[in-house]
């Protein structure tokens, strides 16, 4: 299932999941501050789950 998720991210975003591991303030481990853009906000919302 993780491979399918990677394929979905690549198809929609045009980049693999590794790109987002250190993206913005909230994509990847931890997070603090204000989300930098819509993608970072999505990671922020996910972190709040």
Swiss-Prot record:
The record's comment on cofactor binding reads: Binds 1 Ca(2+) ion.
Which cofactors does it use?
Ca(2+)
SMART domains given in the database record: PA2c
Q: In which tissues is it expressed?
A: Expressed by the venom gland.
Main localization, broad class: secreted
Q: Which InterPro entries match?
A: PLipase_A2, PLipase_A2_dom, PLipase_A2_dom_sf, PLipase_A2_His_AS
Q: Which GO terms describe its cellular component?
A: extracellular region
Question: Which of UniProt's keywords are assigned here?
Answer: Calcium, Disulfide bond, Hemostasis impairing toxin, Hydrolase, Lipid degradation, Lipid metabolism, Metal-binding, Myotoxin, Platelet aggregation inhibiting toxin, Secreted, Toxin
- The EC code for this enzyme is 3.1.1.4
Give the GO terms filed under biological process for this record: arachidonate secretion; lipid catabolic process; negative regulation of T cell proliferation; phospholipid metabolic process
Q: What is catalyzed by this enzyme? A: a 1,2-diacyl-sn-glycero-3-phosphocholine + H2O = a 1-acyl-sn-glycero-3-phosphocholine + a fatty acid + H(+)
Q: What is this protein called?
A: Phospholipase A2 2
| Organism per entry | Lachesis muta muta (Bushmaster)
């Amino acid at each position: 299932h993780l491979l399918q998720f990677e394929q979905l991210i690549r198809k929609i975003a045009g980049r693999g999941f590794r790109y987002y591991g250190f993206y913005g303030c909230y994509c990847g481990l931890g997070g603090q501050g204000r989300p930098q853009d819509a993608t970072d906000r999505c990671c922020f919302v996910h972190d709040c789950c």
